[in-house]
Amino acid sequence: MPVQIHTGIFARNSSLISNGNPEQLNNLFLEYPDTRFVLFHFSYPYTSQLFSLAKIFPNVKLDFCWVPMLSMNMAKKYLNEFFDLIPYNKLMWGGDSYTVEEAYGATCLAREIIAWVLTERVKNKEINSEKAIQIAYAILNQNASNFYGLI
């Protein structure tokens, strides 16, 4: 069974921002290498630390939830950085919402940001349009389905 962990300022951290630092999970990942972990919210403001953990540990995946609602520009920046550092099969979109309306709105924002970032990469000839579609589908569907055993 996978373990979901809220990180960053959305971790309900009793107003102590440092409680959301994913570096505190490093020993947990070392101790349980066969456990699958998914970390939420890109750990803002500890995104660099999060990306380092996701790159190092094969059992750590990331969920992009809530990032677009915090800041569209920040979401674009960090998604671009993610693609520079980490294989896209380690990223999924989960929403982390309480209502259908909230989930729908959040997903619309996520799709817009993913499309914008991938379009820029196609324009810059970093990837072709077919690869962009493959990446978007993986993030929005396939990666979570694989991770949670839905298919």
PLM features per residue range, with description:
Residues 6, 41, 62, 96, ...:
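Divalent metal-coordination and catalytic microenvironments
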Residues 30-33, 55-58, 83-87, 99, ...:
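Hydrophobic alpha-helix feature that most strongly marks membrane-spanning transmembrane helices
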Residues 41-87, 91:
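C-terminal structural cap/anchor segments
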Residues 1, 33-36, 58-61, 87-91, ...:
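Short, well-ordered coil/turn segments that N-cap beta-strands
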Residues 38-42, 86-108:
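Short acidic/histidine-rich active-site segments
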Residues 13-22, 47-56, 72-80, 100-116:
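Histidine/acidic-residue-rich catalytic or RNA/ligand-binding cores of hydrolases
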Residues 1-49:
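Divalent metal-binding pocket/active-site signature
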Residues 88-89, 105-151:
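Mid-to-C-terminal alpha-helical segments outside catalytic/metal-binding sites
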